[in-house]
């Protein structure tokens, strides 16, 4: 039979490894060698062993975990005669303040523990139920699902006093709904009943009798009764607060949620900050917009934020009455109360520069010169640079290189020289000179004036026949007169009456180099 290897046990992290030395997990040298023939009482791992029976009983495992955290199970009240008969393992005169008392094992196996217990000690300290309240074997260590639900509802602001029917039937239905896991435990052979009609009134911490099908409002959470009820949650006092008074009928403006599976629904009241910094209460469920505070900034509750974020995830598109489609950018807008589109804000150090550049790019195409026609570009004469251009060390403005003797250059009508490979791509984008912005197409001025007047709302037919212009706009009349003068100048140059060309209007007497 092959012998088992020697195991090394780390006392710092409870790691087990076979190679001697420091612990490979935490690098601690507080290790101990465990041989295969080590007695169980000498095994350092015995403290971490869990009995196999505890896996079949979750309640016993939970008690073991609570005891390891320092939260012992303490019987808080004197058991009755009936309970002493049913539970022979209990002491006849238990001390409520004793810390070494052990629970009845039969209670863990059958699961019949009392529902009139306090909130878990791991959350609220060593608080115990009141002695003499008639509650048998109150165990603060047992976690009650209904108490956990009420605990989170208190934190989320969802456990305010709610209206409840005065009938005994509705009260019994509410008790069964609030504690469904323990309804069977109350009916299985328990002869002793608490004196109070509602056993949960004696639980440690805060108890708020709230129906699950009626989520409370923010208006009710501001009442003094709610503050007195929820204040002992984080205190270690053993005195339970009295239950708050129950109104006889629902107040106006409170919405009712008919689905009991979603107690954290959107509230009907929210708070808002006014212009002067004062808090105002706004009823969001009313249809009258006059009830809302003018100029108030809403402080949305968690339920409304989740409803806005996840309310339309499954919607294929924005349809009337179904909300907006899901947009990740709207998440930050709802949380931080951003007005407008988040893309309109300047985020980061270069945010403002990016917005200005985007606006300039959008406005560039409105008044930018049109590209030169291909036939005009093809008719341009390609030549060698003249000698005086070489002597003056002229350079191409586009590529910023000096002209050489063997370079192919093109002279524009404005008398400026450029490289052939530089000016042709330029003219295909911008039909003007790169130096003086003079158009290379003689007919481009007429087309630009026509397009400008069309954009301003004027009829281009008036320019074709200026004598029929009947507009009263002074600016349009001046443009017509300018166009007439330019047309007469073009006609006179074609008949030889003048040697001035239309291009001379854009060229200075001394061209720029």
UniProtKB/Swiss-Prot annotation:
Superkingdom to which the source organism belongs: Eukaryota
Compositionally biased residues, Low complexity: 82-106, 229-238
CDD domains tied to this protein: RING-H2_RNF126-like (cd16667)
GO-annotated biological processes: proteasome-mediated ubiquitin-dependent protein catabolic process; ubiquitin-dependent protein catabolic process
Region (Disordered): 72-113, 155-262, 439-513
A single GO cellular-component term on record: cytoplasm
Ranges of Polar residues composition bias in the record: 164-189, 210-228, 253-262, 442-493
Zinc finger (RING-type) stretch: 396-437
PROSITE patterns assigned to the protein according to its UniProt record, in alphabetical order: ZF_RING_2
Pfam assignment, any one: zf-RING_2
Biased composition (Pro residues): 239-248
Protein known as: Uncharacterized RING finger protein P32A8.03c
């Amino acid at each position: 039979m092959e012998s088992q290897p020697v195991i090394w046990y780390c006392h710092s992290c409870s790691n087990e490894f076979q190679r001697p030395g420091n612990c490979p997990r935490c690098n601690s040298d507080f290790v101990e060698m465990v041989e295969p023939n080590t007695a169980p009482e000498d095994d350092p791992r015995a403290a971490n062993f869990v009995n196999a029976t505890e896996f079949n009983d979750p309640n016993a495992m939970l008690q073991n975990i609570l005891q390891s955290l320092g939260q012992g199970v303490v019987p808080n009240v004197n058991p009755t005669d009936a309970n002493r008969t049913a539970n022979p393992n209990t002491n006849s005169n238990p001390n409520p303040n004793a810390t070494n008392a052990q629970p009845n094992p039969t209670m863990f196996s059958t699961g019949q523990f009392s529902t009139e217990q306090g909130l878990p000690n791991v959350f609220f300290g060593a608080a115990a139920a009141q002695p003499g309240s008639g509650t048998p074997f109150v165990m603060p260590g047992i976690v009650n699902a209904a108490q956990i639900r009420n605990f989170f509802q208190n934190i989320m602001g969802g456990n305010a006093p709610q209206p409840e029917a005065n009938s005994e039937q509705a009260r019994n239905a509410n008790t069964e709904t609030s504690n469904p896991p323990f309804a069977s435990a109350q009916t299985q052979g328990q002869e002793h009943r608490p004196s109070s009609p509602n056993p949960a009134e004696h639980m440690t911490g805060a108890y708020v009798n709230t129906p699950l099908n009626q989520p409370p409002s923010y208006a009710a959470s501001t009442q003094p009764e709610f503050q007195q009820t929820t204040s002992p949650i984080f205190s270690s006092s053993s005195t339970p607060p009295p239950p708050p008074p129950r109104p006889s009928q629902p107040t106006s403006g409170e919405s009712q949620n008919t689905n009991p599976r979603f107690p954290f629904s959107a509230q009907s009241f929210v708070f808002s900050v006014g212009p002067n910094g004062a808090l105002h209460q706004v009823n969001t469920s009313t249809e009258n917009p006059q009830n809302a505070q003018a100029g108030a900034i809403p402080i949305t509750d968690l339920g409304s934020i989740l409803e806005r974020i996840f309310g339309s995830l499954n919607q294929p598109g924005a349809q009337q009455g179904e909300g907006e489609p899901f947009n990740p950018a709207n998440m930050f807008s709802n949380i931080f109360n951003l007005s407008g589109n988040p893309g309109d804000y300047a985020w980061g150090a270069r945010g403002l520069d990016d917005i200005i550049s985007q606006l300039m790019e959008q406005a560039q195409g409105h008044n930018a010169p049109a590209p030169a026609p291909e036939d005009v570009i093809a008719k341009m004469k390609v030549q060698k640079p003249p000698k005086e251009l070489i002597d003056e060390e002229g350079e191409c403005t586009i590529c910023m290189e000096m002209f050489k003797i063997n370079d192919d250059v093109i002279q524009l009508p404005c008398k400026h020289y450029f490289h052939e490979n530089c000016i042709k791509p330029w003219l295909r984008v911008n039909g003007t000179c790169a130096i003086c912005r003079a158009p290379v197409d003689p007919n481009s001025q007429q087309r630009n004036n026509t397009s400008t007047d069309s954009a301003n709302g004027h009829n281009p037919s008036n320019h074709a026949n200026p004598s029929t212009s009947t507009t009263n706009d002074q600016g349009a009349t001046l443009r017509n007169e300018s166009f007439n003068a330019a047309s007469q100048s073009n006609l006179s140059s074609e008949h030889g009456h003048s040697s001035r060309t239309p291009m001379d209007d854009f060229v200075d007497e001394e061209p720029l180099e």
